[in-house]
Amino acid sequence: MSVEEEVFRIQKKMSKMASDGTGQDQALDLLKALQTLNINLDILTKTRIGMTVNELRKSSKDDEVIALAKTLIKNWKRFLASPAPTTPNNSSAKEGSSNNSSASKSTSAAKSSSSISGKDKSSSSSSSKDKEKKGSTSSSQTSFPSGGMTDAVRIKCREMLATALKIGEVPEGCGEPEEMAAELEDAIYSEFNNTDMKYKNRIRSRVANLKDPKNPGLRGNFMCGAVTAKQLAKMTPEEMASDEMKKLREKFVKEAINDAQLATVQGTKTDLLKCAKCKKRNCTYNQLQTRSADEPMTTFVMCNECGNRWKFC
């Protein structure tokens, strides 16, 4: 098994530990296994093991696990802070100079040195291209202003909220979407003090409601300050719903109440009332006092043929 495959295997186990808290007794052994592996910057980038170890450190209560996790993260950060190693160009230049000095002694040695330097130059150019690609990838991933934030999960959630706030036109005089998104994410994080599933579900519900094209009022009220970040962080789905959805829910509630009233009271059959839907005179009606005592009673009618219901006073 290669180093990269071994790191992937350990990363999966640690991710499960950090998410559901199971298997914490194996955390120390896994960290020690990582300490023995020869992990380079390429493996760190592909496996994202650094983020996983950091999440495990936050969720663990074992001092030894926390200390070893900090040590690993500190060692891996040196890959980012260390200066670029000597490129093959420098070594090829030295080899070229030594070969040039000995060129007068042997023509064949000069030819071999020139071929070696040519290979070194091609390898150095390919390595520089790879570094440029990695640099462009890392810069695109960190395009969102983190504001000192180091938690990758929280940064990603802020990006999602900012994207939702940018939908449609931003009213003049309102805050910047990135700043408003950071403020909202911070308010949600303060509710849970971690990035578990409850935190992520809260983020998803805010993103869905802010992106809803039928609910521009919520987005506008938040951007203009009518609704604060703390209020939006605690709102229920009913409170975030659009006016149209609130009216629809109110209508459904009233209809359900009426249906329940008709179902609980045994009606009186009559052929005096005609159904407007099927035109037949096979109905059952009830009379209930739905308003004040001095007002006439409301008659609820149900057609026994087609199930159509209506009421009148």
Curated annotation (Swiss-Prot):
- Biological process (GO) annotations? regulation of transcription by RNA polymerase II; transcription elongation by RNA polymerase II
- Provide the protein's localization: Nucleus
> Residue limits of the TFIIS N-terminal domain?
5-83
Q: Which stretches does UniProt call biased (Basic and acidic residues)?
A: 118-135
Report the residue ranges that make up the TFIIS central domain in this protein: 153-268
Checking CDD domains in the record gives: TFIIS_I, Zn-ribbon_TFIIS
Question: Where is there biased composition of kind Low complexity?
Answer: 91-117, 136-148
Q: Which GO terms describe its molecular function?
A: DNA binding; zinc ion binding
List the residue ranges of the region (Disordered). 83-150
Q: Which InterPro entries match?
A: TF_IIS-typ (IPR035100), TFIIS/CRSP70_N_sub (IPR003617), TFIIS/LEDGF_dom_sf (IPR035441), TFIIS_cen_dom (IPR003618), TFIIS_cen_dom_sf (IPR036575), TFIIS_N (IPR017923), TFSII (IPR006289), Znf_TFIIS (IPR001222)
Q: Which SMART domains match?
A: TFS2M, TFS2N, ZnF_C2C2
Would you name any one GO CC term? nucleus
Q: Where are the zinc fingers (TFIIS-type)?
A: 271-311
Q: Which residues bind Zn(2+)?
A: 275, 278, 303, 306
Write down the superkingdom of origin: Eukaryota
Keywords from the UniProt entry: DNA-binding, Metal-binding, Nucleus, Transcription, Transcription regulation, Zinc, Zinc-finger
What's this chain's function? Answer: Necessary for efficient RNA polymerase II transcription elongation past template-encoded arresting sites. The arresting sites in DNA have the property of trapping a certain fraction of elongating RNA polymerases that pass through, resulting in locked ternary complexes. Cleavage of the nascent transcript by S-II allows the resumption of elongation from the new 3'-terminus.
What family classification does the UniProt entry report for this protein? Belongs to the TFS-II family.
What's the miscellaneous note?
Answer: S-II binds to RNA-polymerase II in the absence of transcription.
Record's protein name: Transcription elongation factor S-II
- Annotated source species: Drosophila melanogaster (Fruit fly)
Which gene is this protein's source?
TfIIS
